[in-house]
Structure formats: structure tokens, C-alpha cells
């Protein structure tokens, strides 16, 4: 250790020491907080098999690439799970992994029945979920039904709260980690509701994948104790 607090000596040496000691190394302050966030609030996964749920091909491909970069596995889904998903997914979607729903027939299924089916899959350990519920889209339905002003705000706030609660309870119910990512921005109302309930949501799928890898490493090292 140098007088500045930096590690002195070959970096590979410290990697080896950390590995033997069971230390999960964070390579930046951002990673330190990301890893602490998921390790402190999510169930320990049984393995490194990730299923990705997304509403569109782009976010799904980005997440799949990110998982590949950090050594996570994307398993095929069982026939039973595929049969569960089929009623919810339009012909334009895909029920492979990543599960690309291309918007579901009922948008609210995205936050309830679909993630439940994926977490019930025996061949997966972790759900990585693209999270999107823009305010302008959600407001359209109550406005179309004749609600105005404060009534619209009340309706949208209730919907955000209900769907966020539906997502937040899944890790405890199924004993599997659920991690989110979004390209919309963490300041959006729905994302804030998720964060308030302890759901980790990242602005970059690679950060999500690295956080998942930290969870997997922790699980592996716990098994060796």
C-alpha cells in the first residue's frame, strides 16, 4: 500500500490474493457501489444462468452481449416455460432467451405473469429485466377515458406504484435475484418507484451484468466455505 492509499505492486498479484481470500474485486468506485447494492439486497443465486426479458430487440441484444462479456450463461428455456409464455407474446415477438416481447398483448403482463413464468423456470438462476413505463404513455389511457388534471396524476401514480410493488416482491417470492436496466433514465417516475422498493435498476446493461457476476462470484465463494 502506497502513501496515497493506492495498491503498490503487480495488479495480477492482488487479483490472485483477492481470489484466494474470497474478496470480490471492484475496479471502480461505481462498481463498488453497484456490487454493494445487489449483494446487500438480493437473494444469492444458485448459478450463473441468466434469462433476459425485454420489450424490444435492441435492449435484449445489448444485455445478451453484456452477459457474454462477463461470462454469464444464457440458457434455453424449457418447453413448459415456452408454453406458459406463448399466450402473452405476439407473433412479432420471440420466446427464446432473450425473451423479446415486442410489447405484449396486455402491457401489464410484462410486470406480472411473464416475469413469474421466467423465475419459475428451473434452468435459470437470475432474471435481467428491461424496465420501461414512460409517463406520457401511461397517461394516455386515463386521459382517453375522460380523466383530467389531478385524476390523471392519481391514476398514473397508482399504476406505477402497483406495478413496481409487483416487481419488487418477486425476488423474495422465488428466491432468485431480479436486476433491471433501462435506457430511459433513472429519474423517470416508474423507475423511482422501483428504486424506492429496493429493485436495483441500472442505466447500462453492462453495469447490470457486472453486478450479476459479483452475485455469482459471491455465491461460488460461499459454497467453498
Where are these regions (language model features)?
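Catalytic-core regions of core metabolic enzymes
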Residues: 1-225
Amino acid at each position: 500500500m502506497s502513501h496515497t492509499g493506492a495498491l503498490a505492486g503487480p495488479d495480477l498479484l492482488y487479483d490472485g490474493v483477492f481470489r484466494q481470500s474470497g474478496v470480490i474485486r471492484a475496479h471502480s468506485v461505481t462498481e463498488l457501489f453497484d456490487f454493494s447494492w445487489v449483494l446487500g439486497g438480493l437473494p444469492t443465486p444458485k448459478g450463473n444462468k441468466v434469462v433476459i426479458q425485454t420489450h424490444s430487440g435492441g435492449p435484449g441484444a445489448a444485455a445478451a452481449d453484456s452477459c457474454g462479456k462477463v461470462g454469464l450463461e444464457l440458457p434455453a428455456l424449457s418447453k413448459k416455460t415456452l408454453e406458459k409464455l406463448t399466450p402473452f407474446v405476439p407473433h412479432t415477438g420471440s420466446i427464446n432467451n432473450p425473451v423479446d416481447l415486442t410489447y405484449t398483448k396486455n402491457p401489464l403482463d410484462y410486470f406480472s405473469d411473464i416475469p413469474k413464468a421466467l423465475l419459475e423456470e428451473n434452468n435459470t438462476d437470475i432474471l435481467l429485466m428491461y424496465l420501461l413505463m414512460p409517463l406520457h404513455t401511461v397517461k394516455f389511457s386515463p386521459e382517453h377515458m375522460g380523466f383530467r388534471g389531478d385524476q390523471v396524476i392519481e391514476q398514473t401514480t397508482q399504476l406505477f406504484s402497483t406495478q413496481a410493488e409487483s416487481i419488487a416482491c418477486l425476488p423474495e417470492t422465488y428466491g432468485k435475484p431480479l436486476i433491471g436496466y433501462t435506457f430511459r433514465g433513472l429519474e423517470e417516475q416508474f423507475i423511482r418507484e422501483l428504486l424506492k422498493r429496493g429493485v436495483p435498476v441500472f442505466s447500462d446493461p453492462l453495469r447490470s451484468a457486472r453486478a450479476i457476476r459479483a452475485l455469482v462470484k459471491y455465491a461460488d465463494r460461499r459454497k467453498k466455505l
